[in-house]
């Protein structure tokens, strides 16, 4: 008698379906829900459906695990062979918007909360272009999954666990650590024989497939979908895809984004900033040309009107040419252009041109001095303003904080 048909419902087959029928339906549904075939805004939902189909097939394709599922279902108590695996009730709820507990669809049946495994975080460097346009990141990962033969118990069918001999059934061991010549600390560590359960199977009762560990390594290609509004340190989560263990709810695999430095743009929030390099002639007379290539590959043409003179350090704002504010609308931040004027090199302007420029450009007013003021003629040398105040003679000294030897005071008699 079949006590639970949820996995069959996911694969859209009858619980008496043959192995060939199950395989055929799995291939059809896997192709239908494959994330690569979904639009970018539906990829996460498709990935959830695809994972649910995959997990259901992983159990039903194996005759032994299918038999155990038919006998005990997914949520029985002491006899459950699937406890600690992927939570298919959550998968069903995400796929169909229903609560599939032991009482059936729509029933609010409380469920014992299981311990949760650790998350796995992968740091990923991404270009500013990919953060602007969005990207699918594929990551090949290896994780521990519940053994398909023993469903994570680590022992043969109907074999009983016994107190772990390594930790005396406590699940932890005492660990002595020398922290100094005459000092030792005592701490507890999880038993590596029973993985903290306190019980284990004897040698003859252990599952031969996983050698009693309850898990086997599995390689999977995970897909993470970076939205076009992604920011530094954003986390993209594949829930429940970390290591599995018996009696444990798997943690998440997390992709944490780190933006690579960009040669042209600097980002702050939804805004971008770039240097606008122009010649002195352009600063004085205006220009009309492509000034840079945008993150989506467009050439950005800018018109500076004649008569509008630009100065070093001026800021020009181009509205709506920054980053996307979110993944659902076309609202964008602004592009800030910082004017950087390139002056001509020494000797480029001849004597005749110099006289013409002096006639055209306004002159600087002279500093007025008294007739009897002593005038010194000086010349400068090229320098670096960052060296200002850096005279080695005054290094590590605070101006105005000098101390002097004083005259000893006479003590009162």
Curated annotation (Swiss-Prot):
Residues 411-413 form a propeptide. The keyword Membrane applies. PROSITE patterns: DNAJ_1 (PS00636), DNAJ_2 (PS50076), ZF_CR (PS51188). Residues 6-73 form the J domain. It is a lipid-anchor. Its main location: endoplasmic reticulum. GO terms for molecular function: Hsp70 protein binding; protein-folding chaperone binding; unfolded protein binding; zinc ion binding. A zinc finger (CR-type) spans 134-219. InterPro entries: DnaJ_C, DnaJ_domain, DnaJ_domain_CS, DNJA1/2-like, HSP40/DnaJ_pept-bd, HSP_DnaJ_Cys-rich_dom, HSP_DnaJ_Cys-rich_dom_sf, J_dom_sf. This is DnaJ protein homolog xdj1. It comes from Schizosaccharomyces pombe (strain 972 / ATCC 24843) (Fission yeast).
């Amino acid at each position: 008698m079949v006590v639970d048909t949820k996995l069959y419902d996911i694969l859209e087959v009858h619980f008496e379906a043959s192995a060939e029928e199950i395989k055929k339906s799995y291939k059809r549904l896997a192709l239908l829900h494959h994330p690569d075939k979904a639009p970018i805004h539906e990829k996460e939902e498709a990935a959830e459906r695809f994972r649910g189909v995959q997990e259901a097939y992983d159990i039903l394709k194996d005759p032994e695990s299918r038999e155990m599922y038919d006998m005990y279902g997914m949520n029985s108590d002491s006899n459950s062979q699937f406890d600690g695996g992927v939570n298919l009730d959550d998968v069903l709820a995400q796929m169909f918007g229903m609560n599939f507990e032991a009482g059936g669809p729509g029933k609010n049946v409380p469920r014992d909360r299981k311990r949760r495994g650790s998350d796995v975080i992968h740091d990923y460097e991404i270009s500013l272009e990919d953060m602007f346009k969005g990207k699918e990141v594929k990551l090949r990962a290896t994780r521990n999954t519940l053994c398909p033969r023993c469903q994570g118990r680590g022992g043969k069918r109907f074999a009983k666990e016994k107190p772990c001999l390594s930790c005396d059934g406590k699940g932890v061991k005492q660990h002595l650590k020398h922290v100094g010549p005459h000092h030792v600390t005592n701490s507890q560590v999880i038993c590596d024989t029973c993985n903290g359960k306190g019980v284990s199977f004897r040698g003859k009762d252990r599952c031969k497939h996983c050698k009693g560990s309850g898990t086997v390594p599995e390689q999977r290609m995970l897909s993470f979908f970076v939205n076009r509004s992604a920011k530094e340190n954003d986390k993209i989560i594949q829930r429940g895809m970390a290591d599995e263990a018996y009696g444990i709810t798997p943690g998440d695999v997390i992709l944490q984004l780190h933006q690579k430095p960009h040669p042209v743009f600097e980002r702050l929030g939804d805004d971008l900033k770039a240097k606008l390099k122009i010649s002195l002639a352009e600063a004085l007379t205006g220009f009309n040309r492509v000034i840079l290539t945008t993150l989506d590959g467009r050439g950005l043409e800018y018109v500076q009107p004649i008569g509008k003179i630009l100065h070093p350090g001026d800021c020009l704002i181009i509205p709506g040419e920054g980053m996307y504010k979110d993944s659902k609308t076309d609202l964008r931040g602004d592009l800030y252009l910082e004017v950087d004027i390139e002056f001509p090199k020494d000797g480029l302007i001849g004597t005749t041109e110099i006289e013409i420029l002096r006639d055209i450009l306004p002159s600087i007013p002279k500093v007025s001095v008294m007739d009897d003021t002593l005038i010194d003629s000086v010349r400068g040398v090229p320098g670096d303003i960052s060296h200002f105040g850096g005279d080695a003679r005054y290094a590590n000294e605070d101006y105005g904080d000098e101390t002097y030897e004083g005259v000893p005071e006479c003590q009162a008699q």
